[in-house]
Amino acid sequence: MAYVDGFLLTVPARKLAVYRRISAKAGKVWKEHGALEYRECVGDDVNVKHGLPFPKRTKAKKGEVVVFSWIVYKSRAHRDRILPKIMQDKRLKMDPKDMPFDMKRMSYGGFKVIVDL
């Protein structure tokens, strides 16, 4: 069964183009190493009247946008096998200070797929 790494973070709107460039490069690396899908999505209709809106969930500050992303693998074993190779890929090496978002505020985790249509 497929396995998904999911991410929820905020990015200053003025740094979204930089984030997009970094993410496009990262996505190519993930796919080259075997990820099935790599998606980065920016919030568009997120201030809903029911539930807890993403901006509140992420404590988005003025001028920040919410980013929701995910990476799909064949299985958790597949993810666990390729992730160390991805983390060692020199194309992804960056000083955390140069990231266009606050990594301490990012939420992420691995998820078992329970419905796949």
Task: Name each model-derived stretch.
Residues 18-31, 66-71:
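Generic detector of contiguous secondary-structure segments
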Residues 31, 35-62, 88-117:
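Glycine-rich beta-strand-turn "strand-cap" elements at beta-sheet edges
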